[in-house]
Amino acid sequence: QNLAWGIGTPIFSAFAEKYGDRKAITLGLILYALGVFISSTASSPEAHQFLNIIIGFGIAGSGFGPVLAVVGRSASPEKRSLSLGITTAAGSAGQVIGPPFAAILLSTMPWSSVFEIFAIISLFTIILVPFLKSKDTSPIKKNEEKLSDAIGQAIKDPTYIMLFLGFFSCGFQLAFITAHFPAFIAEASSPIVKGSFIGLFCNSVEGLGALSMAIIGLFNIIGCILAGALGKNFTKKYLLSLIYTGRTI
């Protein structure tokens, strides 16, 4: 899924450049919802792997990449940093709500039904796409430069290489935490005692794993908004260095 996400990102970027951001995001949402929904009925490892590729391409078309590109082009230069921070924080809000909601649903229904519910919720977000500011109305002039030329210039820029390596480590860390951290919390935790402080928020160790992801998302909201606000007044490369230092620690 993550590999498909990475491979699909430049493909959807080129698609958005040619056909528009709205169409690219809509296609991404459809692929994501379709992949998640059909996964609820998949019965073999091969089918799940194939559907994970579809989901990965869906994320590439509807995730942070294309959405932040729209926001970056639409926001004025003086408000761009904060706007990007708020948008990223909104994505983290889904991490705060999604895992606990999924844990609650899993306690009352099979996982396949939970997949179907989340697929339907994802599909309904298409109604927000028409409200996106069209690329054609952006004050930035259309760039006629070929994609191959742009990539050639980028790989010669040390700043781009550093950002590339930074995002490589970021993606590894994010994928590792998402895949293993909830299970680690569930396996390492003792049974939840009724009436305890933790018991006020969840009643199972599986729910504790979901709660841990929600807590990460909550602090990510704070960090995104703070970084966006600071980016208006401070040099971004130094802020980014501090952020990566904090993540390393």
Model regions: which residues?
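Extracytoplasmic gate region of multi-pass secondary transporters
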Residues: D157-G228
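C-terminal transmembrane helical hairpin of 12-TM major facilitator-type secondary transporters
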Residues: I216-N220, L226, N233-I249
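C-terminal ends and interior cores of transmembrane alpha-helices
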Residues: I30-S43, R247-I249
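Cytoplasmic helix-loop-helix junction between adjacent transmembrane helices
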Residues: N52-A89
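Hydrophobic core of transmembrane alpha-helices in multi-pass small-molecule transporters
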Residues: G35, E46-S62, F168
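Helix-to-loop junctions at the C-terminal end of transmembrane segments
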Residues: G8-G20, C224-T235
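Helix-loop-helix hairpin linking two adjacent transmembrane segments in secondary transporters
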Residues: T87-S134
